[in-house]
From Swiss-Prot:
Protein name per the record: Actin-related protein 2/3 complex subunit 5
Gene Ontology terms: biological process: Arp2/3 complex-mediated actin nucleation; cell migration; regulation of actin filament polymerization
Keyword Nucleus listed: yes
Post-translational modification: Polyubiquitinated by RNF128 with 'Lys-63'-linked chains, leading to proteasomal degradation.
Organism field: Mus musculus
GO molecular function per UniProt: actin filament binding; structural constituent of cytoskeleton
A Pfam family hit: P16-Arc
Top-level taxonomic group: Eukaryota
Membrane-spanning residues: none
């Protein structure tokens, strides 16, 4: 009887928390190398009047995996600058040019802009939110609000 108990004691060496799907693991995927969007490329697209390309360039390299708040703030200000420079008539066409992940990323930046409103940014961000919601649906909002990695 005791021999059977000793051999079955191996189960105590198993770390059951390792198999918990709700356990948070802070993964570092080499995010320190992410510098965010290229500000020079975005500015050149804005100067040329190519707003859709400026939006694509601003969303191209998001600093999602980095822990540096300065990099995230810089990327947020670049995207906000692009969003503010759009005309109201062109917003829907620009949102339609994005794929599902692009719309989700845009929503992340919109909510980041809502966190720290400036003089006219809230009205512009609400227009962008309306068009992004029409393109991505409610699921886009849910994915942004439940995401662990932020921009």
């Amino acid at each position: 009887m005791s021999k059977n108990t000793v051999s079955s004691a191996r189960f105590r060496k198993v770390d059951v928390d390792e198999y918990d799907e709700n356990k948070f693991v802070d993964e570092e995927d080499g995010g320190d190398g992410q510098a965010g969007p290229d500000e020079g490329e975005v500015d050149s697209c804005l100067r040329q009047g190519n707003m859709t390309a400026a939006l694509q360039a601003a969303l191209k390299n998001p600093p999602i995996n980095t822990k540096s708040q300065a990099v995230k703030d810089r990327a947020g200000s670049i995207v906000l600058k692009v969003l503010i420079s759009f005309k109201a008539n062109d917003i829907e066409k620009a949102v339609q040019s994005l794929d599902k992940n692009g719309v989700d990323l845009l929503m992340k930046y919109i909510y980041k802009g809502f966190e720290s409103p400036s003089d006219n940014s809230s009205a512009v961000l609400l227009q962008w939110h309306e068009k992004a919601l029409a393109a991505g649906g409610v699921g886009s909002i849910v994915r942004v609000l439940t995401a662990r990695k932020t921009v």
